[in-house]
Amino acid sequence: MGNGERPPARRPDSSGSPPPAADAPAASNHPFSSHDTKHMTSRRLASRTAVAASLSALMLAACGGDDSANAPTAGGAAPLTPAVASPAGPTGSTPGSTPGATTAPAPSSTSAGQLSVDKMAFAQTHVVPSGGLSWTLPNASASLRPISRRDALVLVAIGQADAVQPVLEAWKDGAKLGALALSPPSALPPTESGGRAYANDRWSAVVPAAWMVPGVSFSVSASNYTSSVAQAPVFGTDADVQLTILPFYLFGADDTNSPPLSTTQAPDAATQQEIFAKWPTAELKVRTHPAGRFSLATVVVGPRADRTGAAQPAYPVTALDQQKDGYGVMSAMLTLITNMRTANGDGPLNDQYYAPLIALNSNGQFANLGGGLGGVGSGAAVGDHRYTGIFIHEQGHAFGLNHAGDEYAKGAYPYAGGSLSGSVWGYDPNHREFLDVLVPTTASSYAKCASSHQLDAQGRCYKQDPMQGGAGDQSSGYKFATFSDYNTGRMQAWIASRVLADPASSTGYSKWDSAAQARAPYTPTTDNNGLYGVNQNLPVQAGVPVHTIVVSFSKAGSAGASYIYPPFSYTGNLIATFDPTSAADRQAITVDKGTYPWYCKGTGCDYTLRVTYADGSRTYRVLQGGFRAWWTPTVYDANATNPLSGSSFRVWAINVPGDKRIGKIELLDTPMVWNGMPANPTVLLSR
């Protein structure tokens, strides 16, 4: 792009963080078992062992159906392709297709004596047809495909009622991978809370993850019929998701006066399995951040409105009840962890960050947080330590989901009021049961749901999506409500968009190619001439000792708002940054002329971090972004000194080499540093 072209849109706020969504969903108080490991754990679907160990035929109970009951009359959208025959709904419901969603038609060239397969679907997070689901809405589109490399319950509707001993066969490149005996419809698992059966005509088997890969096709044969026409599922990404937990103990909170680290540093094993059951990923890897707990005595809240709606300047907080609105501390911490995630090179990766906030009030008592915040699409969220409704909702924001009711009103969500009215059914492999789109009788919301939920023709309540007050719609024994198929498809899209650290790739990275249904080698590039960093802020050194330094700064001089946080030291990553004492580095970031001509063009490069190590050595790093007018890095923003404006406040996070102990951290005033480093810069802050 030429330097005279129109500048790209500015990111939403002065700290570079995505806009948070504030929430306080109801959260149940399920007890947690102790979980004190800091090592990464992985969760795959339950009930895999027997099938994965032997790919021979076996009988497995399952439940069937490839779409849901009771299609609503509102919220539909024009299909992407011509509609196919309406799939059968659950027993006792009116059959119908999902509004706005289309499925690929099954092959139909059955010959005499050949078994016919009317429907084939795969139950993972949801029951999804082999060709996937897709939606085109007035202001959004999405798709949901079977998840590659993840166990699935295959559901088959057979055209012949007299088929004897039907068998599912898996083929790839002309070779037979194996066969599985299909369990009869009478052996289907139940629906949650003893609810209505999903279908009465589906044969089933658990397909191992090794068969759920692009290029594999499935056919069904019987002892009295030849094999059906094969169906090759259209797969979604095979990427895993890493969930990184960063527990923050604030204002004197510790293990003696608050929930201990052993219960906050990661969800317990059962909760991890339920998270995996809800997220469309091939594998869930959960780790506690390598730094362990983060303890902070002070948090700086940026300019924002107080509880009355009056604008307030940035201010420091040393107890949770000092915040001037209910989300002040959460907002500050969301900005902090989002910037820390970027500084560690995790920004483009398939890594979700969650920070449980453990805080004390001014009386020294543990304080209930009462909600959470997630940066929409940022991969980061904050909330309480219980890992229930707040957690799953805020991580939904981190996946890029907004509030479903608002999106429905804007033509960006297909089901009325943010409900599941029209979604396909869900499936939970841990309980081995289907998840109805209707509120189950054991849900805490069941008794009074009619006043707040969408209703079917019989007056029964549809579930709400977790992104629209769905907490409480889940059956007893579950922590999380059921996402709609549409929102699950959007989460799958977020995962597919991520860069994957991939040792099998020639570049060390790969990305999912949806058209090819395969990973492709990915070479990091610098977008927008370095406006948001170099090589997408991926690591230039990985697995090395680092110090993470976080600085808040008020250009307006708000009392106590300019602050250097205690550094965090751990084994992490370093991204490309620049040393202003190096002429070559200054040339690289010179506005409109350097190697990265837009690195400083957005809002300037006017501040430098100087770190003096215990041995007297020093390192200097330019802090990208400041208080300049957008795209005019020589002129200050009109609100740069307005204490009530977010344009007067910034939070930077940067990793520096951590092989030596830090002696001093200083923030230096270095205006337009690409033009030259001052010989004796003014020290603005010191720690």
Swiss-Prot record:
It comes from the Bacteria. The active site is at residue 394. One of its GO terms (biological process) is proteolysis. Keywords: Hydrolase, Metal-binding, Metalloprotease, Protease, Zinc. It is an enzyme of class 3 (hydrolase). Residues 233-501 form the Peptidase M66 domain. Its cofactor is Zn(2+). One of its GO terms (molecular function) is metalloendopeptidase activity. Binds 1 zinc ion per subunit. Residues 1-45, 73-112 are annotated as: Disordered. InterPro entries: Dictomallein (IPR051256), Peptidase_M66_dom (IPR019503). Its EC number is 3.4.24.-. The keyword Metal-binding applies. Zn(2+) binds at residues 393, 397, 403. Belongs to the dictomallein family. This is Dictomallein. It comes from Burkholderia mallei (strain ATCC 23344).
